[in-house]
Amino acid sequence: MLFRSQPPPPALDALTQRETGVLRLIARGLSNAEISDALVIAEQTTKTYVGRILAKLALRDRAQAVVVAYETGLVTPGAATN
């Protein structure tokens, strides 16, 4: 029986620097309101960033975004949240 490897996680190259930062915060478990406060932006702007991240990476939800962030090494377990 042949085992096919899973395709690699989507490249993060499609994301802007700001979107990458938002993805980092999503992976750390922050809500839209918390991300907005941390980045000093409107909550609606955060929602827009989240939507763009999901669309660019062809993800269904935030949970998948968290998985991608860890699988690509964008965040690592136990790392500081700063």
Predicted features along the sequence, with ranges:
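Regulatory hinge/linker segments at domain boundaries
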Residues: F3-L25, T76-N82
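ABC ATPase NBD switch/coupling site
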Residues: P9-L12, R28, K56, T72
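Positively charged, aromatic-enriched patches within helix-turn-helix-type DNA-binding elements
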Residues: D13, R24, D37-I41, L59, ...
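Hydrophobic residues on short alpha-helical segments
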Residues: L23-A27, L54, V66
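Short amphipathic helical patch at the helix-1/turn junction of helix-turn-helix
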Residues: L25-A27, Q44, Y70
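Recognition helix of helix-turn-helix DNA-binding domains
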Residues: S31-Q64
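Basic, Lys/Arg-enriched C-terminal extension of HTH/homeodomain DNA-binding domains
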Residues: A55-N82
